[in-house]
Amino acid sequence: MEVIHPRCAGIDVSKRDAKVCVRIQGEGRRATSSTVSTWTSMTSDILALREHLIAQQVTCVVIESTAAYWKPFYFLLNDALNVGLVNARHVCNVPGRKTDVSDAAWLADLGAHGLVRASFAPPEPVRILRDLTRARTIVAQARTKEIEPPRV
């Protein structure tokens, strides 16, 4: 299969940390190399990860969307790298891939071959508008609870 992104990273995000696999396609007879590292979800660590991926000349990053754990990684990496957010159901329903390390390697491999379809992640102005709309809805509901008498 043709490799579209010779330098690709796959990130499997969990509650505590993220496993990152950087896949570098070998040239000629050289084998493809993959290195897996673990990064915490602290902002400073994610920024260090961004610098690491830039230093590795990674052109494509694939992040598995799990709960809300993906958000800090996506938002901090997206401004400097080509990041694709993928649904876990679409890429990891393969038997035998049960660990975070193997999932990260699988994501990097799929990303390198261009076999992932990125999910929609709204741009910042849309996110801000959504947050404001949610906040207004919560305030309106709280106001309604205070005004209406309890039903018997």
In which residue ranges do the predicted regions lie?
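Phosphate- and other anionic-substrate recognition elements at nucleic-acid/protein interfaces
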Residues: 1-152
